[in-house]
Amino acid sequence: MSRIYDCADETARKDGIADAASAVRRGDLVVLPTDTVYGIGTDAFSPTAVARLLATKGRGREMPPPVLVGSMRAANALVDDLGNHGRDLMEEFWPGPLTLVCTATPSLSWDLGDTKGTVGVRMPMDPVALDLLKEVGPMAVSSANKSGQPSATRVEEAVEQLGDEDIAVYLDGGETESRVSSTIVDLTYAVPRVLRAGAVSIEQLRAVCGTVIGELRRGPRKPARSEGAEAEDAGEATDPEPRAPREEDRGAPGTAPDGDKN
């Protein structure tokens, strides 16, 4: 039976974060608010827990989740190469709705899915999420919805879709502030490349990086295979038909074409 904590109450918030932290350390799943939509998360370093997260959403290994962190230091430990502009982008837009796809540190013992050696990293601008992340460390987080269903902007919507059997703790942070997904930028190229347009505009990115390759659309838009990743990551909440993935997008955490908006 899931436990739900109203984080508007200070005592409940403290108890909820402690309970959620214990659940994450056990390899259980929790639901938490972010600055985009609600997320379903677990220990990024537990392959069993990540597999359970994907199964609960109805998603395969070809759609690995991005990783949320509570500090730049935590992100630096996950990333082998930030490229020429990664640090500047972090300093300008974190915490906030910008996911950076980078080459992952090869020595890490984890299995997020078919990542092709990359990791999508983001530091959300949400106090409840940050408190939990600082307590437990990096979490694999996907949008708190079943594949093919709308993303949740209220905890009640997440409960309705995910139920109380697979989720140990729900942290209720109220309605999320934005329905717009995070912008995803691939830093594994010499020139930063936008994989998905979102809350951070390409003009804002270019003000920091200079040259940025915009999101490419090849041919007519096709229905997504499952949902509409960080719905964690392929279009806005108001966009029911996210773009089909390009070959270079496949496997990068947070770029799955299924509606994840985290």
Language-model regions, residue ranges each:
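Active-site-adjacent structural elements in enzyme catalytic cores
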Residues: M1-N262
